[in-house]
Amino acid sequence: MANSPIVGQYVQAGTDKVMSCDQKLLADTVRIPLSFFTEKLEIVKLDSRDEALVGQTGVTISDNYILVHGRRPNPFKLFDRRGNFLTNIGAIGQGPGEYQMVYDAKLDEANNRIYILPWNASQLLVYDLQGNVLDPIPLCLRCPKAKFNVDLTGGKVSIVLLPFKGSAAVAWTQDLKGNRLGYMEPGHLEAPQDFSNEVISGFNIPGTFDVNILCIMPTRVDSLYRYDGDNSRLIPTFTLNFANTDKIPWHGYGEWPHHFIGDFSEPPVEVAPGSWTNGKTFHYIVDKKTGKGSFFKLYNDYFGNLEIDYPSYAFSNGYYIRNIEPGNLMTDIENALKNQKISDDMRKKLTDLQASIDENDNNYVMIAKLKP
């Protein structure tokens, strides 16, 4: 990115400095290897016992554990980092410690806790790493869609939710018994009651609760924030100045340790009466120090230089993670081997992996930790 133009600069917004990027200045596309951002890549084969089988769902990683998210009929499942199945976490259902549709989850290895937040939740479900159901944490407001952080040592829970019209708060901090300690009213962040809208948090920087309230219906000018629970503030950090403010595209923002990243789409296309999909999506990256930026593509140079889809969403909770079924992994290897430019070492690595895969295997998980 050293040769990329300056596309953004910091501007003062009250007491805060916000990186303001100009959409019109984004031009060239750079291809960046995954190794530029991460330390190394592990490929973990998950335990293939019947009780360990998982779908191609979300995954949360810690130093020693892999938490595969639940999706009917499978509950959340906990593995060690070698892929050994340890236990189910909760169950699908409506009873104590059970859940159906889940919006967010956290794996807190240091405190022997797993937290699960269902859609439209009035409580945060709590488990230990042995699979035991613990007392839930009552929430002082119901959460249609929300992201959260738990400070168990400090006895605090921070929540940022999708603030539908009439919501008392967009963000708040409470204790573990549900008593509110501080909150922030929605104000201009209030969103229409449409479940197409989202709350996005990457949690890719230790100690930072980044938040993008993603409004699709309708779109609007907005910012990336950090939630400061101690002072009940959403602090703006980044925004994109759109070339045409009359037609704001679908878009999102995020941040990594040294970069802001984002995406925007061409106008939505109606694929069926009342059913819309976004047009072509563009992903961009901006250096936090220099303001230099460009459109970008991310490719997995640990794995045959295959391009990574949706690069601005490549990392979560400090990791690149891909949960992939064995058949899809075989297809990826076949596609990578078609590239005549990969090294002999890479070709051997891929063919050795290819030979070890059985179609009846459980899923494989690619894991690469973000550099600080």
Tell me the role of every PLM-derived stretch.
Residues N3-I43:
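Blade/loop signatures of beta-propeller domains
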Residues M19-S20, N64-R71, N112-P118, G155-K165, ...:
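Short beta-strand elements that form the blades of beta-propeller/WD-repeat-like
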Residues D47-Q56, P75, N84-N111, P118:
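Blade-loop segments of beta-propeller domains
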Residues R49-E51, G90-E98, P138-K145, G187-P192, ...:
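Short coil/turn segments at the loop-to-beta-strand junctions that recur within blades
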Residues V54-G58, Q100-A105, R142-D151, Q193-N204, ...:
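Repeated scaffold domains used in trafficking and secretory/extracellular systems
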Residues P75-F76, A121-L125, K165-W172, R220-Y225, ...:
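Structural motif
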Residues Q100-V102, L117-A169, Y183-P192:
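Asp-box/WD-like beta-propeller blade repeats and closely related beta-sheet repeat scaffolds
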Residues I235-G252, K288-N317, M330:
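Conserved blade-ending motifs and adjacent loop-strand segments that build the rim/top face
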